[in-house]
From Swiss-Prot:
Originating gene: clpX
Family, similarity comment: Belongs to the ClpX chaperone family.
MF (Gene Ontology): ATP binding; ATP hydrolysis activity; ATP-dependent protein folding chaperone; protein dimerization activity; unfolded protein binding; zinc ion binding
Descriptive protein name: ATP-dependent Clp protease ATP-binding subunit ClpX
Entry GO CC: HslUV protease complex
InterPro entries on file: AAA+_ATPase, ATP-dep_Clp_protease_ClpX, ATPase_AAA_core, Clp_ATPase_C, Clp_protease_ATP-bd_su_ClpX, ClpX_bact, P-loop_NTPase, Znf_CppX_C4
């Protein structure tokens, strides 16, 4: 009776017992005949066969004629006039005209500065400095949307980072190099595109120094992060781990020059209005001037009077404030603005829902009363435009669950009762009204 040999192995008997002998699965040589043997799941290969395979592959590669490389065009962001930038922002962002105008001019000058660097003479005495931007405004006023829309318009890589996740190097959390790693990923690892991208740092007010007094304990997520950000905000060559951070310390670093990266920082800066009002009240003493107050506290116009000293008192260090020369404030959205946000922008949330329903062959309609009710609930929540989607999503989830199964339905009308009480919307099939299917 003969027994088949397991691939790459044979069993031999000796005086000390039975042993397995290993053979190369390609040439048949035993482990004793070669220098090394590499084992796979069901096969073995010796060093001689590896060398032979390598020589064959090298000959095949060399036999292929080289492909002529077309020289790549240098990456050039779209240089759009400030007026065109503002008009484009207006298609997606409702209101905030002062902030849009300020952003449009700052962004235009930033990329114009980049274009002029190549033409600038070495002996030119005038050097245009970088114009990073600080956006100050309540939650849900459009800070992130403005930055995102700018990047889309200019066709440059864009990345968002939450400042609250950042800590000093050596502490648990993300270090500032993570910001650049995310932009590198957004640019598909194209270094030239990365170095002309836009980074939006959200919640920048959360890294304000916790106290005006110098503390003996280290503030690793406040002043320490501000100090770490100074270098990349101003412009420096930073070694960035492509996989992002401290989890892969062995990876090779990619050097990114940040001098042409535009940084837009945004935050609500809750309580800043009180600091400004305090300063204004002191400076106006003796002249009978008073700071006007409203139901929401200080005059909404008060933030427009912000100065660098106010930001310093709030907790930002002077060096950090100096890296953000363009300061723009956003207004609290009123009822009319929120109503317009629901229906006017190109990507308005109601238009998005209508598009989704259209894919199922259903026409979606919101009554005027329903839209008013959405705005009213959003205002009560106090989170600005951000609440609009939350209110609608809470109502629409059940309807979107049912619609794909309602094959004969051609129209769905959302009423005020649907928004307020989650009552059934009005369904239409041809000329007949249908009730909601439970």
């Amino acid at each position: 009776m003969t027994r088949e040999r397991e691939p790459g192995k044979s069993r031999t008997k000796s005086g000390s017992g039975t042993t397995d002998q290993v053979f190369c699965s390609f040439c048949g040589r035993s482990a004793q005949e070669v220098n090394s043997m590499i084992a796979g799941p069901k096969a073995f290969i010796c060093d001689r066969c590896i060398k032979t395979s390598f020589d064959i592959l090298r000959k095949e590669v060399n036999a292929v004629p080289p492909v002529a490389k077309v020289p790549e065009q240098p990456f050039q962001p779209r240089l759009v006039s400030p007026k065109a930038i503002m008009d484009s922002l207006g298609q997606y962002v409702v209101g905030q005209d002062a902030a849009k105008k300020s952003l449009a001019v700052a962004v235009y000058n930033h990329y114009k500065r980049i274009d002029s660097q190549e033409q600038q003479q070495a002996d030119d005495e005038v050097v245009i400095e970088k114009s990073n931007i600080l956006l100050i405004g309540p939650t849900g006023t459009g800070k992130t949307l403005l930055a995102q829309t700018l990047a889309n318009l200019l066709e440059v890589p864009f990345s968002i980072v939450d400042a609250t996740s950042l800590t000093e190097a050596g502490y648990v959390g993300d270090d500032v190099e993570t910001i650049l790693a995310r932009l590198l990923h957004a640019a598909d690892f194209n270094l030239e595109r990365t170095e002309r991208g836009i980074i939006y740092v959200d919640e920048i007010d959360k890294i304000a120094r916790k106290s005006a007094n110098v503390s003996i304990t280290r503030d690793v997520s406040g002043e320490g992060v501000q100090q770490a950000l100074l270098k990349i905000l101003e412009g420096a060559v930073v070694g960035v781990p492509p996989k992002g951070g401290r989890k892969h310390p062995e990876q090779q670093l990619i050097n990114i020059n940040t001098k042409n990266i535009l940084f837009i920082c945004g935050g609500a800066f809750e309580g800043l209005d009180k600091l400004i009002a305090k300063r204004v009240s002191k400076s106006s003493m003796g002249f009978g001037a008073k700071v006007k107050t409203t139901q929401i506290g200080y005059d909404p116009e008060i933030l427009k009077l912000v100065m660098q000293d106010d930001l310093h008192e709030y907790g930002l260090i002077p060096e950090f404030i100096g890296r953000l020369p363009v300061i723009s404030t956003l207004e609290m959205l009123d009822e009319k603005a929120l109503r317009n946000i629901l229906v006017e922008p190109k990507n308005a949330i109601t238009k998005q829902y209508k598009k989704l329903f259209e894919m199922d062959g259903v026409e979606l309609e919101f009554t005027e009363e329903a839209l008013d009710k959405v705005v009213k609930i959003a205002i009560e929540r106090g989170t600005g435009a951000r609440a609009l989607r939350s209110v609608l999503e809470n109502v629409m989830i059940d309807i979107m669950f049912e619609i794909p199964s309602m094959k004969n339905t051609h129209k769905c009308v959302i009423t005020a009762d649907t928004i307020e009480n989650k009552a059934a919307p009005e369904y239409f099939s041809g000329d007949r009204k249908k009730k909601k299917i439970a």
